[in-house]
């Protein structure tokens, strides 16, 4: 039976989530990429709380000249989520690529978050 792209992404995400869990000391930086936007959340899986979030749906990022589905927009989201996490005292996270390949916009979020001071 041939596996389509959606099923493959779902299986990859399940495999990743079995291995990765966020703790209060080192929460999970989860990235979700849609066709139009990109979302990033810092999640404490023990208490099931979202500690920090950023996305291209927010007004400062949405009004940019580049689109919301570009690597530049993903870089801005990564920088913003890292700044908000540092304000809350979070310096180390575990990266969850959400079943997507570590390439393009997902990689741009990770690189920008690292440059802004998050360790993973």
Curated annotation (Swiss-Prot):
Biased segments, Basic residues type: 8-20
GO cellular component: cytosolic large ribosomal subunit
InterPro entries linked to this entry: Ribosomal_uL18_bac-type, Ribosomal_uL18_bac/euk
Keyword Plastid: no
UniProt KW DNA repair keyword: no
GO molecular function, a single term: 5S rRNA binding
Alphabetized UniProt keyword annotations: Ribonucleoprotein, Ribosomal protein, RNA-binding, rRNA-binding
Function: This is one of the proteins that bind and probably mediate the attachment of the 5S RNA into the large ribosomal subunit, where it forms part of the central protuberance.
Annotated protein name in UniProt: Large ribosomal subunit protein uL18
Organism the protein comes from: Gloeobacter violaceus (strain ATCC 29082 / PCC 7421)
